[in-house]
Regions:
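Acidic, His- and aromatic-enriched active-site or binding-groove loops in soluble protein domains
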Residues: 1-10, 86-98, 127-144
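His/Asp/Glu-rich, glycine-adjacent segments
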Residues: 1-87, 91, 212-258, 276, ...
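Short helix/loop capping segments that flank catalytic or ligand/cofactor-binding pockets
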Residues: 76-78, 120-121, 128-141, 170-171, ...
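Short secondary-structure boundary/capping segments
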Residues: 81-86, 122-132, 200-202, 296-298
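Metal-dependent active-site segment of extracytoplasmic phospho-/sulfohydrolases and closely related
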Residues: 92-127, 280
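Active-site neighborhoods of enzymes that stabilize oxyanions during catalysis
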Residues: 147-334
């Protein structure tokens, strides 16, 4: 919270749903108290969640649209491999099949995940230690140019970093050298974003409406977009000013190591979050950032939140045809896509 100059929220936000607008739009969400149990009793929590979902739907089946979110499955994929969870996924399939058959052909169903999972055994990235060894202070408020604040969002493959604006580039120089760091992203003075690795630098710009994008890189191309722009130019799909359309970039990068990177970075820079981070850090597979207390309870076999494909790409299936690849914002029901400002 920049106005109060302190980190607010924490684990209780997840449990309470406070200041999480999308939860208010759901007809079913895993109860807050139940979101604390999966790391202690994952399978029992999961099957209980399926039962609550089934009961809630049958009580509200007359609604024209029923929106549900199963939160326990996220924890399951942090703790187990996909192969280990196959019976649990089949149980979910049975619940959905039962609901669908009860609709007697009059019910449409859309299932999707909101992200992927690296499925790589993961450990904490020593970012805090790295910064402190280089003279930075990791704390809950920002007073001086060497102060850094990094909220803990669970255990995920990214870190949101807050600092004094004048310290951004120097801090980015330090972050790219930290163990486990893959990409460092921050807004630049040209109105776009700079993407850094330890061996390369990229600059991304976009038009006001987001329909056109420009990209350049020096050293090793951090987003692997130069080859994409070169191919689009050869196909005559770049404008005279060297920009690529948003649609062309999505089509060309949806299956890349960094899926749809231009739009995802642009959305970070322009999205509805009031207290946007000064720097985003995307971690390599095998690393996470977050509340360290969880590391003493369980071993993580995977996580999500990073830019790379396994953490990013989810699935979607439905009773109506879907395209081979689609952004989540284009997939979600209209009832869900009402934007609200949040802190």
């Amino acid at each position: 919270d920049r106005a109060q100059n302190r980190i607010r929220g924490g684990w209780w936000v997840t449990l309470s749903g406070y200041h999480v607008p999308y939860i208010k739009r759901l007809d079913y969400d895993t109860p807050g108290w139940a979101k604390a149990l999966p790391y202690l009793a994952p399978l029992k929590s999961y099957y209980a969640d399926l039962g609550r979902l089934s009961d809630r739907y049958r009580k509200e089946r007359d609604k024209p649209v029923f929106l549900a979110h199963l939160a326990v499955s996220d924890a399951m994929f942090h703790l187990f491999t996909a192969e280990q969870l196959e019976p649990a996924l089949k149980a979910f399939e049975d619940v959905v099949r039962s609901i669908y058959l009860e609709g007697k052909g009059e019910l449409g169903v859309l299932l999707f995940s909101d992200h992927g999972n690296s499925q790589v055994p993961s450990r904490p990235a020593p970012i805090n230690e790295h910064l402190e060894q280089r003279g930075w202070r990791v704390r809950g408020s920002i007073e001086g140019v060497r102060d850094v604040a990094m909220p803990d969002y669970g255990l995920i493959g990214m870190a949101a970093v807050y600092c004094k604006p004048e310290a951004t580039e120097e801090l980015a120089d330090v972050l790219v050298e930290a163990e486990g760091v893959d990409l460092v992203v921050y807004a630049n003075s040209s109105g776009g974003a700079t993407i850094r690795t330890s061996v390369g630098r990229g600059h991304l710009r976009w038009s006001d409406d987001g329909s056109r994008n420009w990209y350049e890189a020096t050293g090793q191309d951090p987003l692997e977009l130069l080859a994409v722009f070169k191919r689009l130019r050869a196909e005559g799909r770049l404008s005279a000013d060297g920009s690529a359309s948003d649609a062309d970039l999505f089509a060309a990068t949806a299956g890349s190591w960094y899926p749809d990177p231009a739009a995802r970075i642009r959305n970070w820079a322009l999205n509805h979050v009031q207290n946007r981070a000064d720097i985003l850090v995307s971690l390599k597979p095998g690393y996470f950032h977050g509340a360290g207390v969880f590391t003493h309870i369980v071993d993580f076999v995977g996580t999500h939140g990073a830019m790379e494909s396994a953490s990013t790409l989810g699935f979607a299936m439905g009773t109506s045809p879907l395209p081979p690849a689609q952004r989540l914002a284009d997939l979600l029901p209209e009832e869900f896509m009402k934007t609200e400002k949040r802190k």
